[in-house]
């Protein structure tokens, strides 16, 4: 069990040391924001349809 924890910790450390390019991070953030906006719009449409 301790070995698994150690492996996951070292993997997380390795992943965090890999620096993402600023552009890639910006693109990911934009995608995430767009996705959230689309979800909110769909929810609003569903609520309006149910109310009507």
Curated annotation (Swiss-Prot):
Result of mutating residue 21 to G? Reduces inhibition of ATP2A1-mediated calcium uptake
Q: What is the effect of changing residue 36 to A?
A: Abolishes palmitoylation
Extract the Pfam families matched here: Phospholamban
Ranges per topology, Cytoplasmic: 1-31
The tissues where this chain's protein is expressed are given as: Expressed in testis (at protein level). In brain, expressed specifically in GABAergic GAD67+ neurons of the thalamic reticular nucleus where it colocalizes with ATP2A2/SERCA2 (at protein level). Expressed in the bladder and in the atria and ventricles of the heart.
Q: Where is the signal peptide?
A: none
Tell me, in one coarse class, where this protein mainly resides: endoplasmic reticulum
**What is the official name of this protein in its record?**
Phospholamban
Q: Which organism is it from?
A: Mus musculus (Mouse)
